[in-house]
């Protein structure tokens, strides 16, 4: 009897293991493949931008479309644009070719500067997050190529200008923020650059010219709108043109709208007054009906009172008649007896019964 119990326990454990394996497979299939998604050691899903845990993979699209996530993305993009714009506004002196020893010094100083200032990649964001910044920073390639261009026909006297460039760059690096990325120094020739120098995944500094152009366009549009709104009424002789420029309704349309609104208000007032009159009529009708009912009740009461009085009078009359009839009957009986007495007395007693 003990052997079947063990078999059942073993079967239950195997079933549990199979169920857990299936759950793991289903959970692995449902994993979110997104640069913004992150799984911890326990397999819990979290958002890299918001630093918030997400209960289920089904809630990931709703979180991406949420207001908080969009605000965080906009803030990060805004800080990226603000930190990258000052680095491009620094003006460097004219760049010339230096001797072979100068590039080595430049490289050593660049490594020191990179160690002193942390790069923008410490934000722990995915590489494909700022794709727009990468496309906008593509305009820096010509300037970088100019910085890294060939300058073979320069004399050795240009070394002094190279030293001035180094001093200017050191002064500018002290002004850069920790999130900014310094520009690469020029080398002796373009062949020393790696093959994928302009195709790396590191977020490049966006050019401030595009931002300035967008700001200028927005200002122009705002000025145009402000000028159209600032025009006084009647600036143009034609009222229709004046209304069109000031982006308002034409006088005729305005009059029509006002007339329609007036008619609408009149209809509303009429409906309200009709409702009030109907309510008052209904109340008056009910009051009249109540008064009529009260009058009918009073009339019925009077009729009942008259009927009762009639009955009492009839009863009294009947009693009087009965008493009179009794008295008359008694009077008649008494008169008959008195009339018979003398006739009996005057008769002869001898003749009594003679004819019988």
Swiss-Prot record:
Lineage top rank: taxon: Eukaryota
Regions annotated as coiled coil: 11-33, 278-322
Ranges of Basic and acidic residues composition bias in the record: 99-118, 125-135
GO molecular function, one term: zinc ion binding
Sequence ranges of Polar residues compositional bias: 80-90
Region described as Disordered: 71-195
Keywords for this protein: Cell cycle, Cell division, Chromosome, Coiled coil, Developmental protein, Metal-binding, Mitosis, Nucleus, Zinc, Zinc-finger
Gene Ontology CC entries for this record: chromosome; nuclear speck; nucleus; spliceosomal complex
BP GO terms, sorted: cell division; mitotic DNA damage checkpoint signaling; mitotic DNA replication checkpoint signaling; nuclear DNA replication
InterPro entries: ZNF830-like, Znf_C2H2_sf
Primary localization: nucleus
SUPFAM superfamilies, sorted: beta-beta-alpha zinc fingers
Disulfide pattern: none
Location(s) in or outside the cell: Nucleus; Chromosome; Nucleus speckle
Zinc finger (C2H2-type): 47-69
Pfam families: ZNF380_CC
Comp. bias regions, Acidic residues: 150-165
Known role: May act as an important regulator of the cell cycle that participates in the maintenance of genome integrity.
PANTHER family, alphabetized: ZINC FINGER PROTEIN 830
Protein name (database record): Zinc finger protein 830
Top-level taxonomy: Eukaryota, Metazoa, Chordata, Craniata, Vertebrata
């Amino acid at each position: 009897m003990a052997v079947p119990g063990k078999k059942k326990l073993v079967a239950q454990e195997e079933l549990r293991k199979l169920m857990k394996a299936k759950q793991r497979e289903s959970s692995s299939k449902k994993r979110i493949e997104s640069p913004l998604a992150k799984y911890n050691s326990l397999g819990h899903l979290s958002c890299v931008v918001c630093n918030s845990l997400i209960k289920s993979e089904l809630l990931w699209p709703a979180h991406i479309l949420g207001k908080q996530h969009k605000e965080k993305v906009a803030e990060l993009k805004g800080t990226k644009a603000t930190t990258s714009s000052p680095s491009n506004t620094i003006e460097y002196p004219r760049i010339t070719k230096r001797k072979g020893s100068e590039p080595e010094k430049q490289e050593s100083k660049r490594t020191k500067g990179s160690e002193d200032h942390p790069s923008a990649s410490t934000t722990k964001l995915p590489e494909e997050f700022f794709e727009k910044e990468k496309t906008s920073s593509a305009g820096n390639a010509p300037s970088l190529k100019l910085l890294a261009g060939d300058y073979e026909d320069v004399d050795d006297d240009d070394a002094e200008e190279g030293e001035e460039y180094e001093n200017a760059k050191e002064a500018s690096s002290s002004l850069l923020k920790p999130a900014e990325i310094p520009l690469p120094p020029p080398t002796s020739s373009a062949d020393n650059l790696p093959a994928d120098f302009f195709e790396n995944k590191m977020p490049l500094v966006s050019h401030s010219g595009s931002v300035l152009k967008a700001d200028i366009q927005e200002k122009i549009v705002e000025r145009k709108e402000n000028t159209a709104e600032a025009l006084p009424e009647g600036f143009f002789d034609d009222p229709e043109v004046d209304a069109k420029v000031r982006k308002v309704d034409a006088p005729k349309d305005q009059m029509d709208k006002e007339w329609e609104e007036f008619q609408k208000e009149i209809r509303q007032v009429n409906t309200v007054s009709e409702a009030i009159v109907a309510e008052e009529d209904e109340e008056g009708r009910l009051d009249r009906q109540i008064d009529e009912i009260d009058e009918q009740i009073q009339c019925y009461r009077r009729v009942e009172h008259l009927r009762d009085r009639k009955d009492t009078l009839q009863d009294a009359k009947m009693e009087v008649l009965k008493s009179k009839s009794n008295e008359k009957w008694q009077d008649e009986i008494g008169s008959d007896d008195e009339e018979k007495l003398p006739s009996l007395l005057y008769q002869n007693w001898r003749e009594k019964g003679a004819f019988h």
